[in-house]
């Protein structure tokens, strides 16, 4: 999940006026390794952090690592490690003042990087954009690589647009006028990338909303994919399930979308659950026209059908031992308050200090044989009970990843609960429920930036490729501006960021699967 940009006073350019290029081992056959300082620092004893690639750096082959790295996925690889990294970039101004035309935007639309890493060191051997800016997708957030173990006959990587804007899909994306391009449509779709062929396409039937991630759940012999609405208008978020008879049917956009609904009508939103309470529910079918329609239609349908309302669903990860058990983050919202008239939560005015400032990790248990038949929702971690400005609880959980023993949780404090600490990575022990901070973002390159403004985003267990306890993580350094250019009333910016290899003792295990992945995040 990506935050709105900070005031201009905080946006300090890097040392060079153009793109910063830091070279280390650039001419070595072992690959390129950044010499820039790490944007993440260890907290737990024994944690090791190695920065691999920093935004703005150019490889010998000409590839330049673009800004706002987010979702990470790891391919099968061979002698080397194949890594995919989303870029949560957008040429749509964010924020934007229509009255004055003043806004901030990125240099590119969303893109997908394919990197080849040295298995021994993590150094970058090659890089390329396999989904380019010219595809006109916006704000790719988290990602997930679905494989044979998830009921797919072809490896499909899901990218997820966290956006609501109307954009041209050909020509210039924004503004979406005929003079700029064609094929205008609302963003907020899931994009499927065929790893073998390199083809990619939109899967409209997976719903149009602010997608954080689309995660395939193993054990059903056919595609079962969960996704959540990382809405900009929280609290108004839902949990969706997409089912297809085969990966070929999914690729043809012929699957079906479902939404989670509580069996207890009075327990229909985030605020109705607390403590050790749980609620049974099921996934109900979304009409195809609604699923493939615009975001307002899906939101209106969910309200009319009393679909369970979360505040802001972020990333999703399944339990490695029992994959029908699924964990997902909800970032919370201080302005979320009860509305007696609708029996739903609503957003209060700016400055509201409601009861849900920090967020939660939810747990949903699906039926082992038929995920549509029944599901039980409960709270795994409730950070809201810690109250405001409490450094000892999780603040805005965003991206998550599981190993056989633990759940890794990345924070994105954004504009909530800032000033206490930089964004952290927590480890939750699934066997005994203990929580500990293992690493945190290092904002020392911009000391004037409020603590918590940067975030660590994509996280993926990389232990099968880099050894026990290894993870790939990236950082979004939103106020570390590598490049800035004024074009009329718009300011184009290249925000800083970094890809890192992190080793966490007992955090990842050599026998864990690592093709699953990470959100603003962010996101992520």
Region spans (language model):
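Sequence/structural signature of beta-propeller domains
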Residues: 24-516, 522-524
